[in-house]
Amino acid sequence: LGRDYHKVVRARLQKLAERIAAAVGPFGHRVFCDSAPVMEVELARRAGLGWRGKHTLLIHPKRGSTFFLGTLYTDLPLTADEAEPDHCGSCTRCIEACPTGAIVSPWRLDARRCISYLTIELKGAIPEPLRAPIGNRIYGCDDCQLACPWNRFARPAALPDFAARNGLDAASLVELFGWSAEEFDARLAGSPIRRIGHERWLRNIAVALGNVTGKDGVAGETSAIAAVRAALA
């Protein structure tokens, strides 16, 4: 709900590269954060930052999995760290928690069923069988992470960049659905949410409103119901 993490993390990685260059001299490098086909989770695992959970995300033994990954490619000769062994054991809480059954087996994710994919990447209508499990989620889903015991160690981000802005953490679905395209662009400027565009924003909220009809002030409002149906088409 804060600033676009792609930009924040890339900027911080670039500053890190500049500090390294100041210490060792010019060196070849490039930074990434969800900005290129880089296997960030697997690279992080091999770098010893954690192990891959059954939900396919990286788990750090002291920070859980609720963090962003960024990558700094370099041509500097560095000593490789040892990979962290798996600590998930027989736990399957993340698999059981997934609302749409997207984690089809340990370490295997069917992205076509993942709520994060459906609400962020998918263009067009969300398949009807997957609408009800989405519940009131309108941008992504973290249920598999919330269910993970290792996230008892997770802490809120310390950077003010990631603090919720514009009341997004308290707004009702009806209020958000009423945003015009201009208001959407203005209030979500600098946020990763803006990337999905106003049309998909309305589609996602329409699905959520359909799932909570009668609980969020929609029932009986003919104009609102008509707008929801139009967004779902």
Task: Label the predicted regions.
Residues 185-187, 216-232:
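Amphipathic alpha-helical scaffolding segments comprising HEAT/armadillo-like alpha-solenoid repeats
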Residues 1-87, 126, 135:
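Auxiliary alpha/beta "docking" domains used to position bulky ligands
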Residues 113-129, 163-181:
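Short microdomains enriched in Cys/His and/or Lys/Arg
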Residues 83-93, 103-106, 194:
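Flavin-dependent oxidoreductase catalytic cores
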